[in-house]
Amino acid sequence: MKVLRPTQPTSEQLTVINNHKPGVFVVRGAAGSGKTTTALYRLKFTVRYWQRRHRDGFIDGPVRVLVLTYNKTLRGYIEELTKEQIKGNDVELTISTFAKWATDRVPYERILQEHEHNGKLDALAAALPLSEDFVRSEVDYVLGRFTPDRLTEYIECERQGRGRSPRMPASLRRRLLDEVIVPFQEWKKEQQAWDWSDLANAMAAKRADDPYHVVVVDEAQDFSANQVRAVLNHVTDEHTLTFVLDAAQRIYPQRFTWAEVGLSVGPHNSKLLSKNFRNTRQIAAFAAPLLRDVETTDDAAIPDLSSCGEDGDKPLLVQGTFTQQMDHVVQFLNDLGPENDESVAILHAKGGGWFSEVKARLNAAGLAWVPLTRTGEWPTGPVNVALSTMHSAKGLEFDHVIIVGLSSEVMPHATEPGDSERDAHLRLLAMSAGRARKTLTITYKPSEASDLIACMDPDTYDVKAV
């Protein structure tokens, strides 16, 4: 699978790359602005700075470097790129997801399976006037933002970034805390089991024996406050720590302020990357309206249409049964030709068994493909067609993106603006669309279409009925 290599840094990116001063630096930017490229170049030069410190005798042992990514797929992609940036026997490099990094470093109880976690929350919240999906998301938000001894702060806190609907007055928050969250915490202890929030808390409480001199956290908008606290607890007294993020692409319920995790972030140690180097003007114009009514924060960056340097076809919406949708996909891949070296991502909101027909049709057509979802290693062979969930495509980029089967069944939510699940799905769709460099195709069956179709600007796409 082709990795799209970093290009020469721009003058805008060089202001970040050439800032070697120890401390925290935050890189913000919209999809396609080169955030990860900038972070990797910055990593290269900051590691050189620390290598000089090592050679000059200011630090003992190797320069310890940690790169944390959002998921396994992105970890494999970043590792493939980072290998080219970091040289030298005096560097100890770790590239990992937060979960893998944490489970390698703390003794832990078994991690709850998703069905156990969700089943218990659903049972505890049955009497609340809230949907199951919202309760799960809100509980994850609370347990990710507040440490176990400060959970009551949730009752009066500002829930910025959590949407305007459903409303959560203090009385309902108190019920959620008393009837769901506290009993859930007690139940986990009885089961001698943890969830991912417990892992973050354990890492935040454990002082590392081998702290890191250099840390890069990519896609940091989907890290929880407690995960950030854990990272801060595992750096040397003098360190270089880089967070790379865009809150407009947040697809998990994490929202906190830098101040509440003990960091001061301002113009002196942050940079907004405004230019879009990835998308054509047409793809950026399609993605931008999806975020128009989505609640944003200071860390969000909306795609800048004026900065796109390339023109292309409008995104294409293909209407038909799933069989007809796949007819179009197979024809598109065949039209690229056997010698094609352009990368293609076929994305779905759910993955798993939902990809069964996609795989069967590609196999029947003799078209090779590779899976990307939860793959820890980036596939290095010649195959350039990848299957992935929309979530796992985060942080990646491809020449062509095809989002298949966009239905109300796989992306259910309330229809009113401000609904938290609707906002999350719009961010997910905009993020997925922003993975495409050249073409974007979305397929769906009109009678089962997701309500998100209505959020798209008709002037920004073409329609093909098959």
Which positions does each model-derived feature cover?
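Short amphipathic alpha-helical boundary/capping segments
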Residues: 2-8, 124-128
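A long, hydrophobic alpha-helical segment
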Residues: 19, 58-59
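Conserved helicase motor core of SF1/SF2 NTP-dependent helicases
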Residues: 6, 11, 25-56, 62-63, ...
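Generic hydrophobic alpha-helical segments
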Residues: 13-16, 43, 117-128, 199, ...
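N-terminal pre-P-loop "Q-motif" helix
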Residues: 4-23, 196-199
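ATP-hydrolysis module of ASCE/P-loop NTPase motor domains
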Residues: 108-175
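Short coil/turn segments at secondary-structure boundaries
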Residues: 30-31, 151-156, 194-201
